[in-house]
Regions:
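Short, polar/acidic, helix-capping and beta-turn segments at strand->helix junctions
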Residues: 1-153
């Protein structure tokens, strides 16, 4: 089954691809590698999910924010590649959580994005290697930022 069909069957709506927040490329293709710059939890209304996890958001709200980051990444891929079916697999995900120092469930939060990608590309191709880490702050006080390296067909 195709990634595009899987997305449709999930009934999820992609937000618009986020605008750039600085001097960088949202997507860079090098051979069969597709690098996607860090994305935040961008919503349909153009706003972002903000706040510090463990203070302003609980772990489940943060996990939902990470899923929203995944949707924003999918929107950027579609805008730049034309179709999610051009992606073969997820290679590496780096998830950054804006959290209080005592928060320890960063991997649980980033599962929001990883589980989405597994549903889009299947377990074999949608799950790659990953790091999930905590930060004292993120740009614009966003709750989660994620960057991903994909392999193209």
């Amino acid at each position: 089954m195709s990634a595009e069909k899987n997305l449709t069957e999930l009934g999820l709506t992609l937000p618009p691809a986020p605008p750039r927040g600085g001097v960088y490329k949202p997507v860079l293709i090098d051979g069969k590698h597709c690098y996607v710059s860090g994305h935040g939890p961008y919503l349909l209304n153009g706003k972002s999910i903000t706040g510090k996890v463990g203070k302003d958001l609980n772990e489940d709200e943060a996990k939902n924010a990470a899923q929203q980051v995944g949707l924003a990444i999918l929107a950027t891929l579609k805008e730049n590649l034309g179709s999610l079916d051009k992606i073969k697999r997820v290679i590496k995900t780096l998830g950054m959580v804006n959290a209080i120092p005592e928060f320890e469930k960063h991997p649980y939060v980033i599962n929001g994005c990883s589980e989405l990608f597994a549903k889009i590309w299947g377990d074999d191709n949608g799950i790659g290697v990953r790091s999930a880490v905590g930060f004292g702050s993120l740009p614009g006080n966003i709750a989660v930022e994620i960057e991903v390296l994909f392999e193209l067909h």
